Amino acid sequence: MNHLFVGVDAQSVRMEPYVPSFFHWDGLLAGDLKLPANPLAPVQIAPNIGSYVGGDITAGTLASGIWDRDEMSLFIDLGTNGEIVFGNRDFLMSCACSAGPAFEGGDISCGMRATDGAIEACTIDKETMDPTLTIVGDPDQKPVGICGSGIIDIISELFRCGIINAKGLFVREGKRVKRDAHGMGRFVLAGEHESETGREISINEVDIDNFIRAKGAIFSAIETLLNAVDMSVDAIDHVYVAGGIGSGINMKNAVNIGMFPDVELEKFHYIGNSSLAG
């Protein structure tokens, strides 16, 4: 993002070994960027760290405050590239993983960003399979699609209710479970008459498989960082989760589906758009 902001060719970041064209940029003025401010006002850009760990993660780490604490903290920024930072005031290590766009509603048939009409939370009755949806927007807002936090809840609830197995395949039939001509299952969250768009809102086995890959990338990145410093999840005192995937994440559900490490829920903190805050 820093490259695009200052108009520098970002090609090097896309090609192995993924080295940014610059790390720090000094002497930049508002006039250089045509910003609506005093043209001589200096502009500071959060420095790139390396590879896919850019200035947004520098800003997010600053906002999280983990750099100024004695306790060991984990900072997770959920997006198309998932970035992880681990450490305390003595050291910080980071890595990036290709999680794909599932956390932001991409690669999901009814996915969307966390805007009006997005299903951001869900519970499912184990007996009737009826879902209870929390939707972004006014109280009478009908669902339009599913955002990242909603996907986490839905998959966790489907697994808890025995509707899908650990591979994300539908193993229980019911009024909310439908199958296409090829036998692929889907769970209907809102029928055509219940949605804002007049189209069915559902989550299918391909959606679930895409999400399993995304959450697996995040968990693998966390394990990679911990292994690099010869530590286990027991060393984690705080977990800060960022990303524009909803107004909040049900951390228990995220742990249940193997997306986050199994630590005490009190250690989790959702901090929203940390890049903007930083």
Each model region followed by its residue ranges:
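Glycine-rich phosphate-binding/hydrolytic loop that grips phosphoryl groups
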Residues: 35, 52, 56-63, 212-216, ...
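Glycine-rich phosphate-binding loops at beta-strand->alpha-helix junctions
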Residues: 1-4, 233-253
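Gly/charged contiguous loops adjacent to phosphate- or pyrophosphate-bearing nucleotide/cofactor binding elements
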Residues: 152-214
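Phosphate/ATP-binding catalytic cores across multiple sugar-kinase/actin-like superfamilies
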Residues: 57-60, 212-234
